[in-house]
Amino acid sequence: GFLFYDENGNGTTDGAESVRLPSVGVSIGGQTGTTTAGGRFSLASVPNGAQSAQARTETLPAYFTATGVSVTVPATGDVALPARLVIGSRNRPNVYLAFGDSITVGEGSTDEEGYVDDLEAQMRTFWGKADIVNAGQSATRSDAGRSRLPGELGRHRPAYVLILYGTNDYNDPACRSAFPCFTVEMLRDMVQDTRSAGAHPIVGTIPPVNPQYADRNPTERNDWVRRMNDLVRQMAAQERAQVAEIHGDFMRQASLPPLFADFLHPNDAGYQIIQQAFFRAITQPLPGAAATFADLGPTLLLPPGARP
């Protein structure tokens, strides 16, 4: 059988529903397995007769849900198991809004596209369909991002928003002298605005800067980034928003300077790290997924501003 993204929620595969979900646990009649490429699965020793079948909720990608369906064993053809991603009625399935500053724009990469094109190609290979709209705007801080997000949401009507803001906030004197200034609350507002618009947020942690630029206080700035990211993660946990662990992935590398084109902007190798962090965040479960999904409402993952 196979596990598919049931875009319209009718429980059956329709012609345009081409997304399949690999690496998800499934269960039929007490037998379990994991989907492979193309969302395929094959379970041995399933008892004959009517059996309950479904994807295991705690293994689904972030924000997906699943309900059981009844199947007859032995089946006469493929068993198609549905998984749902509840979005607003006007939102477009499989559309992602990349939203941030010049790092989202892609400055510093060879093709000036950053992580976006490669992530789109990776998602198309893994799930079967993805369109990423790049709404990055250079030299903007998180407060400017908060102001322009509603317009971008209305214009593009995405299913997901990939939020990567905070790097330029350090340049505001208030953010250095009155930590944590506005950054975390602006990110929280973006998460809530995303949900209010019927989409799902993925929050990227702020990447470090290149420590090789000794004349630009990189040690002090990277300490600021580290402390801010601690608060970003706390906020995301409070909002039950999925995190793309960009900062942690950078810090796990052997050396930071080879990942940068300049003081702030990653090079191609650095953008690959951002790409992989967003890919994992989209395709892997939310932390504590079993508890989170148990409390789902009928239209959105959580109402805007909800707290655990």
Residue ranges and their predicted role:
Residues 84-138, 148-157:
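Serine-esterase "nucleophile elbow" of acetyl-processing enzymes
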Residues 95-105, 131-136, 159-165, 200-205, ...:
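Structural recognition of the beta-strand scaffold that forms the well-ordered cores
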Residues 7-15, 20-21, 27-44:
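Short, acidic Ser/Thr/Gly-rich low-complexity loop/linker segments typical of extracellular
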